[in-house]
Amino acid sequence: GGAPAEVNDQQWRNQIRLYEPAEGIYIAPRAPTNNWNLWHEGHIDDLFDRLIENCVMLAGVNPDKVYLMGYSAGGDGVYQLAPRLADRFAAAAMMAGHPNDASPLGLRNLPFAIFSGADDAAYRRNKIAAEWSAKLDDLAKQDPGGYPHRLNIYPGLGHWMNRKDAEAVPWMANLTRNPWPDKIVWHQSGRLHDRFYWLALPAGTAQRGLTIRATASHNTITLDAPGVPRLTLRLHDRLVDLDQPVRVVLNGKTVFDGKVNRQADAILKSLQQRADPHSAATALLDVAEKTGGE
């Protein structure tokens, strides 16, 4: 980042040649700008959404088999993008990057690989790779079943890892996205979003630093959402049995207990938001905190 356009163009051409996966389609996009934060800017999220949609609709790509990886400045972007776009991908691999202010909280359901040369000391990339893996270790201990990850630090190698990091490709190819996980951790950072897995916020209400923890178990959905007075549940029979009553507990209080009807409009609205048929809701339920004597 921050380099002249011709330097970034050359690096882009290098990335095109870097991997030749037999497992599927490999796309190496060029960042739209030459700023220092090439892959951190807000428009990048929209770029990837559109790119994924085009691949699904025009190239027959399975939306549950889409993967994210990036090298150097691209690795910086993976640190940033993977947690906040975790519901789009089946796995992510970060190579030789730096997270800056990224948070790993959103990676609860996204297998995440970290690759670094042991001698890649610039900006402490090697040390921070190990520190981020330790953060994921701690999160996984606190949340069994969550935060799957792996760390590869190659002795004797610096910023260039002699393509050893290519082992990420077959590792990712064996993984499949679950668009309806029974537990979600949604943390707002960088670019704000109003939809994540089976949760949605009213437009314009997302705030940086906001964290929502949601669990679905035995047709009860429990939401720990401090500072969130209302939100929408995007439901599907892969998450709850819509033939049975659904109970919703928001911030410790039951705010709904009853049947939720399947709705064609829910499918339409989901697909209008994102051309991702596997994550399309079949029912929508708006819930709000109870106040006063309610």
Q: Which residues does each PLM region occupy?
A:
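Primarily recognizes the serine-hydrolase "nucleophile elbow" in alpha/beta-hydrolase
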Residues: 3, 7-8, 64-108
